[in-house]
């Protein structure tokens, strides 16, 4: 989720999306 990365800061998305 690109919006989540920009919003959350890419640290929370790391665990969610696994990026």
From Swiss-Prot:
Classification via Gene3D superfamilies: NAD(P)-binding Rossmann-like Domain
Pathway: One-carbon metabolism; methanogenesis from CO(2); 5,10-methylene-5,6,7,8-tetrahydromethanopterin from 5,10-methenyl-5,6,7,8-tetrahydromethanopterin (hydrogen route): step 1/1
Activity regulation behaviour: Very sensitive to O(2).
EC number in record: 1.12.98.2
A Gene Ontology molecular function term of the record: N5,N10-methenyltetrahydromethanopterin hydrogenase activity
Catalytic activity: 5,10-methenyl-5,6,7,8-tetrahydromethanopterin + H2 = 5,10-methylenetetrahydromethanopterin + H(+)
Superkingdom per UniProt: Archaea
Keyword Oxidoreductase (UniProt): yes
Alphabetical keyword list: Methanogenesis, One-carbon metabolism, Oxidoreductase
Single GO BP term: methanogenesis, from carbon dioxide
Family membership noted in the UniProt record: Belongs to the HMD family.
Subunit structure: Homotetramer.
Function, in words: Catalyzes the reversible reduction of methenyl-H(4)MPT(+) to methylene-H(4)MPT.
Name by which UniProt lists this protein: 5,10-methenyltetrahydromethanopterin hydrogenase
